[in-house]
Regions:
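Amphipathic alpha-helical interface surfaces
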Residues: 13, 61, 65-68, 79, ...
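Active-site nucleophile-His-acid catalytic modules used for acyl/amide transfer and hydrolysis
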Residues: 76
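Generic beta-sheet signal
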Residues: 3-5, 32, 79-84, 116
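Conserved P-loop
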Residues: 1-72, 127-129
Length: 133
């Protein structure tokens, strides 16, 4: 399952994603991974949630990010939830490219039974593609 949260910067998406991760970790049977482009949320997360700062790995585009996700999933078969905070802060891509990436991630989630939650910052003038809704 994949769930995408789209809203303007500063609307509280990160806070809600952290709360969701911490709450779900209490009942999760598998492992959880939280992916962000900076380490600030790390101290707010339950310590059993694996935190990954993408700045440490040089992730720049959709291909890099998808490869990193595949590596994370292939290295731990017990992953149940993945939380991605600020996708457009992590990678440089267009809304159309991100829709294609999200479709590829959705295929991964179906194949491996993983839940993925993604925060995306949008401008008021940007229209969210159908593939992301």
């Amino acid at each position: 399952m994949i769930q995408v949260f789209c809203a303007r910067r500063g609307s509280g998406k990160t806070k809600r994603l952290i709360e969701l991760a911490n709450h779900q970790q209490l009942e999760a049977k598998g492992d959880s991974v939280y992916i962000d482009d900076d380490s600030r949320p790390m101290l707010q997360l339950n310590r059993s949630i694996r935190f990954i700062d993408t700045m440490e790995y040089g992730v720049r585009d959709c291909s890099d990010f998808y490869g990193m996700l595949c590596g994370i999933i292939s290295s731990n078969y017990d992953i149940e939830n993945i939380y991605i905070d600020g996708l457009f802060n992590i990678i440089n891509c267009t809304m159309k490219e991100s829709a294609q990436l999200i479709k590829r991630i959705a295929n991964l989630t179906d194949r491996f039974g993983i839940n993925v939650y993604i925060n995306i910052n949008i401008n008021g003038s940007e229209e969210v593609p159908e593939g992301i809704k």
